[in-house]
């Protein structure tokens, strides 16, 4: 039965019976859930599969009746009060589960940019040749960052700084008005990063807190990301270094400026860094190997459970499959 059919059932007892029967009819081997609502806790408590797993998804370690295993990233450090067995998996962080490239093709996005962005950039004097900038919450932008952007704009007069995202952008607006560079800046509110994200030639990452998801999104589009390693937060940033091009992580403002300028004027270097950005993005989003490893661990757990019970929830056939019959 479809999820919609279950949603339409209002009687709690009837719904519970039909849900349990559905699992039995489908002979589910493994059930995995990452949201322990009433129905999940109920189904796990009466046991609807030989192996029942709670996927913490990198956030909360939640134990409740009927959970055989917690599925956790290896980087997690569960406290010793947790009694449930753990299946771990390799993970950079929770961002890996996000789809970085978005639903738009590059051609579709650029067609939209021809209407909503490029005409505005072409009106600038001198006409914008390069687009640098960032997107994300405006509270991540500070005056130190803006001063470095100012230096880049002054060095490369055909560049324009483009920034968009949610929050109060008055700091950026006032800063560039005061410095007389308001005509070299395009500032906008929240918008679709999978359209406007294609506008950047170089993504100038904010600091001291790096931008996280937005940097990975533009890297998936082949856009180089320049970052600054703030010495006061180096320990906090260090786990994220594998998600950046090490040759584009600056340790001084001047180095940051030089990195951005070189990307703008050195075509060969830019193309190399485009490929590097895509490769890092693929490393983050290619989950096949890690997923297969998790699948193998789950399959072994299922084999142990079936061998222990001798019946596998009433079924006596041996398990000769490469993957569990169903993962829900």
Role assignments for model-derived ranges:
Residues 10-16, 167-169, 182-197, 210-211:
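Conserved active-site histidine-acidic residue motif and adjacent donor-binding/catalytic loop
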Residues 2-12, 187-189, 247-255, 262:
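Short acidic-hydrophobic, aromatic-tinged amphipathic segments that line or gate anion-handling sites
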Residues 259-328:
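C-terminal amphipathic helix plus adjacent low-complexity
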Residues 1-64:
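Active-site and donor-binding regions of nucleotide-sugar-utilizing enzymes
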Residues 88-179, 183-191:
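Conserved catalytic-core segment of nucleotide-activated headgroup transferases in glycan assembly
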Residues 29-30, 131, 202:
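Structural motif
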Residues 47-112:
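Active-site-proximal region of nucleotide-activated glycan assembly enzymes
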Residues 65, 79-82, 201-202, 206-285:
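Catalytic binding pocket for nucleotide-activated donors in carbohydrate/polymer assembly enzymes
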